[in-house]
Amino acid sequence: MVHLSGDEKNAVHGLWSKVKVDEVGGEALGRLLVVYPWTRRFFESFGDLSTADAVMNNPKVKAHGSKVLNSFGDGLNHLDNLKGTYAKLSELHCDKLHVDPENFRLLGNVLVVVLARHFGKEFTPDLQAAYQKVVAGVANALAHRYH
């Protein structure tokens, strides 16, 4: 569960309505793979991930990033039940993919960086604080199966 004030919820949803999921999702996942290269091991089937340019222009990275961000958007509609919303994804990432749950936190932080880059001054410190709460809640929900 993420505790946001009414103003924070409105701000988070207001900005989210402007997010170009394909663009932001691909960039966020791409940056995760570049900044934290050990995360690439989960995406070996995506082809060439040998350089930053290869990662950022990889169509499979872009497509999966979009999928990830669509799932994040679903979570925004269920902030009071993130664990339930992400239960199946948590199980998949824990039991089948064996993803280190720390990677969820890293991706959340990268997403905040990408949102700041895309929205500039509109992404105020208060809005960043609200999004940090949300990405922490999502990361916690995705890591739930690990506990």
UniProtKB/Swiss-Prot annotation:
Transmembrane segments: none annotated. Residues 3-147 form the Globin domain. Keywords: Acetylation, Heme, Iron, Metal-binding, Oxygen transport, Phosphoprotein, S-nitrosylation, Transport. The modification N-acetylvaline is found at V2. Heterotetramer of two alpha chains and two beta chains. Involved in oxygen transport from the lung to the various peripheral tissues. This is Hemoglobin subunit beta. The lineage of its organism: Eukaryota, Metazoa, Chordata, Craniata, Vertebrata.
